């Protein structure tokens, strides 16, 4: 098991975001923070890190539980814990 992993790869393997290219685009737009700091696609993440991801009007806060190079669909949800999900009003 890896001790660190690129953010874009983690998001894809954990299925928080379905494709690595989409994860990269979201990070490049500044919509992902790791431990309170805006992250780039190549930012290394580790177990215990807290992610905040903005998907349009939705903000998801998740804690990384473990890193896996590959994970089956059933195992992917064990890689993180959702701490909070909230909706925002983007029109404000």
UniProtKB/Swiss-Prot annotation:
Keywords: Protein biosynthesis, RNA-binding, rRNA-binding, tRNA-binding. GO terms for biological process: translation. Gene3D superfamilies: RNA-binding S4 domain (3.10.290.10). Signal peptide: none annotated. The keyword Hydrolase does not apply. The keyword Protein biosynthesis applies. It comes from the Bacteria. One of its GO terms (molecular function) is tRNA binding. PROSITE patterns: S4. Residues 5-65 form the S4 RNA-binding domain. HAMAP family: RqcP. Belongs to the RqcP family. Key component of the ribosome quality control system (RQC), a ribosome-associated complex that mediates the extraction of incompletely synthesized nascent chains from stalled ribosomes and their subsequent degradation. RqcH recruits Ala-charged tRNA, and with RqcP directs the elongation of stalled nascent chains on 50S ribosomal subunits, leading to non-templated C-terminal alanine extensions (Ala tail). The Ala tail promotes nascent chain degradation. RqcP is associated with the translocation-like movement of the peptidyl-tRNA from the A-site into the P-site. Associates with stalled 50S ribosomal subunits. Binds to RqcH, 23S rRNA and the P-site tRNA. Does not require RqcH for association with 50S subunits. This is RQC P-site tRNA stabilizing factor. It comes from Listeria innocua serovar 6a (strain ATCC BAA-680 / CLIP 11262). The lineage of its organism: Bacteria, Bacillati, Bacillota, Bacilli, Bacillales. The gene is rqcP.
């Amino acid at each position: 098991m890896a001790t660190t992993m690129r953010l874009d790869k983690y998001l894809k393997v954990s299925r928080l975001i379905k494709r690595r290219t989409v994860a990269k685009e979201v990070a490049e737009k500044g919509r992902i923070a790791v431990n309170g700091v805006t992250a780039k696609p190549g930012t290394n993440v580790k177990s215990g890190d807290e992610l905040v991801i903005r998907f349009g009007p939705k903000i998801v806060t998740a804690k990384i539980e473990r890193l896996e190079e590959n994970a089956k669909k059933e195992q992917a949800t064990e890689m993180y814990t959702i701490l909070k999900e909230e909706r925002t009003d983007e029109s404000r």
